[in-house]
């Protein structure tokens, strides 16, 4: 973990590197500082993975979610793997998300904003810095962006070259996602056929048979009215956005660019970036860094987050109260959510912050 120089958000002008003046939680202890600098320099010369206009479009869609006119679906891996990277795995993850989105769109009657935990989710926060097996104690596995999961000294040593490898895998993943979502793979009729197959071949899928049948009737009605489902861009293509935990700050800084049209700063590693429960300190490096980029942001909040802290995070990350800028991801656990969530809803709403509220059912909620 980085040390904390005497600096506060109120006295430090923001820059892509200003986070370095703050305490940075959950950072690896890179053994070779020069190798890290070289990796950062290389990343800084590589093309952006996403563009400012895309981030603004996602913010606009999330504003509809905040105002009750759309629904947010975010799904994907807890942490992506270098070892399990293939076109088939990317296609299958996208396919599942599209299937969920179609069912949700029909059931809710509103557009579904589709965000994947993909093309960058290569790092994970850890409760302990080391892991012990038998008599051996090594650095903990922090995700393939940092080290390897094999339990030996060399594999667990943080390697800055993995930052560059993560970029290239993210770029390849994004290339496929864009081709799939704009090239016909996401066609509504095809996604509906996948859902029908799921219903027919799975006992679990039979629970959704009624919804699938209703969607089928709706599509046949549209066709009967003369609507060419294949010719409508809105039924043939979809927007699909990427997201990840902006955990490893040297990587995020190196991929931050200034928009040539607006002079705004944007983190070009993903469309949406989030801050985790372990890194959301108001005076910490992660909040400092993300406060200055125009990407839509999210913060995970758990049982230790007080109403005052939630409001302070909103003030720090979205002082202009821009709808769609900030999402709060709750992770209280099913036994505590009824007691802990309402005070936060009241405090944030009372301060007139137009946030998107979403639940992470996989972390802290089992």
Residue spans of the language-model regions?
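Proline-rich intrinsically disordered, low-complexity coils
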Residues: 5, 9, 13, 31, ...
């Amino acid at each position: 973990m980085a040390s904390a120089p005497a600096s506060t958000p109120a006295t430090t002008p923001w820059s892509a590197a200003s986070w370095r003046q703050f305490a940075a939680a959950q950072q690896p202890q890179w053994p070779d500082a020069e190798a890290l600098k070289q990796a950062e320099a290389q990343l800084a010369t590589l093309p952006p993975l996403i563009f400012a206009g895309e981030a603004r479009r996602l913010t606009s869609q999330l504003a509809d979610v905040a105002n009750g006119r759309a629904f947010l679906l975010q799904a994907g891996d807890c942490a992506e793997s270098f070892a399990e990277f293939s076109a088939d795995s990317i296609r299958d993850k996208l396919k599942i998300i599209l299937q969920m989105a179609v069912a949700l769109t029909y059931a809710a009657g509103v557009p579904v904003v589709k965000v994947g935990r993909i093309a960058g989710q290569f790092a994970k926060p850890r409760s302990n810095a080391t892991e012990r097996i038998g008599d051996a104690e090594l650095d903990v596995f922090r995700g393939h962006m940092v080290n390897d999961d094999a339990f030996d000294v060399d594999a667990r040593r943080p390697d800055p070259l993995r930052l560059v490898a993560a970029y290239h895998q993210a770029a390849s993943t994004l290339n496929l996602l864009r081709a799939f979502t704009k090239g016909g793979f996401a066609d509504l009729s095809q996604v509906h056929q996948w859902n029908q197959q799921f219903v027919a071949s799975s006992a679990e899928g039979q629970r959704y048979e009624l919804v699938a049948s209703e969607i089928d009737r709706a599509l046949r009605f549209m066709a009967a009215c003369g609507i060419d489902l294949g010719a409508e861009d809105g039924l043939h293509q979809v927007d699909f956005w990427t997201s990840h935990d902006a955990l490893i700050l040297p990587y995020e800084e190196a991929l931050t660019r200034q928009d040539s049209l607006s002079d705004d700063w944007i983190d070009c590693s993903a469309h949406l970036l989030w801050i985790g429960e372990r890194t959301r300190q108001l005076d910490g490096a992660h909040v400092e860094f993300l406060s200055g980029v125009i990407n839509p942001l999210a913060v995970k909040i758990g049982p230790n987050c007080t109403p005052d802290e939630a409001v302070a995070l909103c003030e720090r990350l979205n002082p202009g109260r821009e709808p769609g800028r900030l999402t709060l991801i709750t992770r209280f656990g099913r036994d505590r959510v009824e007691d802990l969530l309402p005070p936060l809803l009241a405090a944030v709403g009372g301060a007139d912050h137009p946030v998107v509220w979403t639940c992470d059912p996989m972390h802290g909620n089992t």
